[in-house]
From Swiss-Prot:
GO terms for cellular component: cytosol. NCBIfam families: PRK05422.1 (NF003843), smpB (TIGR00086). Pfam families: SmpB (PF01668). Gene3D superfamilies: 2.40.280.10. Keywords: Cytoplasm, RNA-binding. This is SsrA-binding protein.
Length: 158
């Protein structure tokens, strides 16, 4: 069965909207996920939460921690654990670059988006980020509010 010509290349499953507010995003990259069958079926049903998750290095491997993919409703005894550690697939060069940034410069790796690419593979968009201080968050919020107010004024008067 052919896909429609105007179908989007990426089917969004989950987005971490708080990451851009809580962190200063410095760099992004795409990583694959090692998933079980029932996890993929839950993702196809658009059921996932990556808002409180993060990526970490353990034993030379890259892991996604605290992501939530609920159990598949039609799955029986072969269902998965909803909050299990999930291995991330990243090239060695990217992994070493991220590891050096995280260990030396005090940065963190947070997920931004979870989606299926055009080949139907589950991918995770990761960001190398630095945590914002409280005053930076307030400043960001003030800028956003001012831009909304400017747009409203221009629209009403313009």
């Amino acid at each position: 069965m052919n896909k429609p010509k105007n179908s989007p290349a990426r089917k969004m499953i989950a987005e971490n909207r708080k990451a851009r507010f809580n962190f200063e995003i410095l760099d992004t990259l795409e990583a694959g996920l090692v998933l079980t069958g029932t996890e993929v079926k839950s993702l196809r049903a658009n059921q996932a939460n990556i808002a409180e998750s993060y990526a970490s290095f353990e034993d030379g491997e890259f892991w996604l921690i605290n992501s939530y993919i609920p159990e598949y409703t039609q799955g029986n005894r072969f269902n998965h654990e909803p909050r299990r550690l999930r291995k991330l697939l990243v090239s060695r060069r990217e992994m070493s670059r991220l590891f050096n940034s995280v260990s030396r410069e005090g940065m963190t790796v947070v997920p931004l988006k979870l989606y299926f690419n055009d080949r139907g593979r589950a991918k995770l968009e990761l960001a190398l980020a630095r945590g914002k201080k409280t005053h930076d968050k307030r400043e960001t919020e003030k800028k956003r509010d001012w831009n909304r107010e400017k747009a409203r004024l221009l629209r009403d008067r313009g």
